[in-house]
Amino acid sequence: MPELLIEEYREQFDFPVRDYYKRLGLPDKGSEFSEISSHFIEKYHIHWKECPLQKYAREVVSTIDSLGVYQSLLSAGKEDHVKSFVRHHNLHDYFFAVVGTTNIYAEGKIDRATSFMNTSVLKDQRYLLVGDTLHDHEVAQALGIDCLLFSKGHHSEKKLAQTGSPIIHELDQLLEWFLE
């Protein structure tokens, strides 16, 4: 399989991951899919600590925290993996909750978000989902909450524009939503 450039990835990647694998010509079900997914996660575990935070990420979550706004992190990543990443970057004190999926296939994000919102002591609060994929927009729609999309993540600005949700290009632009 040829190397996938970041620009190509941001145009092609999608949820569910099974569909993305299929588009790449990889197995999307059965034991072959499980093996490829497990292999990816094994490689990811070797290198994840090399992944830096996005520019302004720490400053933004710190500033939002200083405003007294509760922040939760919702991810399609397996929850224990996401919590490890958050702890590694010393961000755990900024989040009321870290919610991920129960599997390595990035499946079940809407269900996990729904469960969190229905059982959280914050369930009657106003929410803003900040994401970087079309699926994040879909999650926000399913939950009936506002969505703001970041153009330097998994999906390109061109792809995100299909949603009609507002788009930011740098994470520090998120602060404008809280400081207005």
Where are these regions (language model features)?
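Acidic, Mg2+-coordinating phosphoryl-transfer loop and its flanking beta/alpha structural elements
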Residues: S75, L128-I167
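N-terminal helical cap/lid subdomain that shapes the substrate entry/recognition surface
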Residues: M1-R58, D65
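Conserved H-loop
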Residues: P27, H92-F96, K123, I168
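Conserved donor sugar-nucleotide recognition element shared by glycan-biosynthetic enzymes
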Residues: V17, L53, A106-K109, I167
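Short amphipathic alpha-helix with an adjacent loop that forms part of the alpha/beta core around
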Residues: L174-E180
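A short, structured active-site edge motif that brings together acidic residues
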Residues: E8-R10, H92-E107
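Conserved Lys-Pro-Asp/Glu-containing loop-to-beta segment of HAD-superfamily phosphomonoesterases
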Residues: G108-E138
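Substrate-recognition element of Asp-dependent hydrolases with the DxDx(T/V) motif
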Residues: A57-V86, T101
